[in-house]
């Protein structure tokens, strides 16, 4: 069998999407519910693990064990201010594990905790399964997208999530870059075009400016807000309705997780409605203390509740334009240099967001030709095809230049940040600079690596540090230490320091100091992920066995109670079957967590009672009434009425 093609996965904060490039075009793949985007949700219940729509659909009943927003935690420290503020909004528990966040849930009656990478790996696994089902073969090679703003740690953690899911991550690429590829394929342009990508999704906001010429994409600048998106608009609606409920019913629902979650689901629906209509109604039965909550909201009121957030999207647009450097005629970049404005992300469907952006660009038509939910996965699928060596002419002449999202450098005397790789430098890239000692007879230097845009390291983000020791004693300023920064195509950073006189070298790949996963951690998580997958399959078999047993019972009862069999079956036989079926149904109700073989065993017992009677019925009157399916569910032969001798025991399904 030929190898499965590589796929592109848009791993979103709230929703994810998967695409594949084959037969010369990209296909966005629908999940088993027929949806082309899948919620980035994982739920843990008493009996099973659910991922995607199934997880999001049961969130109201199980809020504290339904995990979403893992992308807001991935690659961050527990005490990161954004994690601290997000935790207030989450119904699930986040704990501190050696300064790394872990999500704590109740699963199958036990308390379990997972790293964000593990949760993301479950979502990635789901996306891969969606692709497997569509392609009919197992996919291993993927390209995964991340926000342009993600720092080194977040990129590495996302890659780790792919590895835990058993995937071969060909590359991590920026979401706007992916959207640009989608756009570039749709619009083959000869002359250079400057494109501004405005990506407002469920959880993050990114603005990027790209120069596209002859199939070559160059990212000129990126800006954004890692914490702005559709969920923030939902929160405004939730707060608005919590206040309304207080006013109308003098009750505060804000401490009731389930009521809040049901309200949030209704708010998300209302928000989507308001993109197409000017009014939306909200109807929730028995929201709190038996009170039905029926209300409505207008588009104008929704816009008023969120106007500061909507206007706030224009700041990063201006920042990106300022950061784009010079235009083709050597002048500073200005908004008149933008040829196209492209909308990406579901939240760009909001009319007010579109009109504010259009006003900012003096009435320019916005580009909505790409489905905003699918553009990123579309581009990732194309990039996956390129990296996997697809020879199709549609991707042949496409070249991609990505950029470093933040300046990278080291601390020099007095806590000054000295950048070696400037923000928006095209990657992969390598840069070396010679430094020297600060004091006489200094035996070693401490190389501290930072990312950020501030002039003092205290305000930037420490990525890692290492020492270069054994420098020959000499007056200050004499030793020559060459520091090299090397960023690879995935945006992963290697830093080395070389003492030119001795040839001594030391280096660091920016990993564990930022709460990265060690190789052992990843291997353990890969094994656990496989175990959970096997558990899921076991659970599925269990459910099938239980359903098979139940439907056998109901079919049997239906058959003997059918008017058509009157006179063809004795009352005694009829009672025997009904009694045995009722006993079995009762047993199933009491044994919801039995094993698969217990259910199968019960079904065999039941068949031993029913089969001889049904055979008599056949002989008495030909065809079988009651529409019993051929071979009956479970298709198990058997006869006799006492508890069967050997034979498997039964298991239950829920």
Curated annotation (Swiss-Prot):
Ranges of Low complexity composition bias in the record = 639-648
Q: List the disulfide bonds.
A: none
Protein name in the entry:
Heat shock 70 kDa protein
- What CDD domains does the database record attribute to this sequence? ASKHA_NBD_HSP70_HSPA1 (cd10233)
Q: Which UniProt keywords apply?
A: ATP-binding, Nucleotide-binding, Stress response
One Pfam annotation reads HSP70
Q: In which residue ranges is the amino acid composition biased (Gly residues)? A: 621-638
Q: Which InterPro entries match?
A: ATPase_NBD (IPR043129), Heat_shock_70_CS (IPR018181), HSP70_C_sf (IPR029048), HSP70_peptide-bd_sf (IPR029047), Hsp_70_fam (IPR013126)
Which family does the similarity line name?
Belongs to the heat shock protein 70 family.
According to the UniProt entry, the coiled-coil residues are none
Q: What are the recorded GO MF terms, alphabetically?
A: ATP binding; ATP-dependent protein folding chaperone
Organism name: Hydra vulgaris (Hydra)
Does ATP-binding show up as a keyword for this record? yes
Q: For the region Disordered, what residue ranges are annotated?
A: 621-654
Asked whether the keyword Ion transport is assigned, the reply is: no
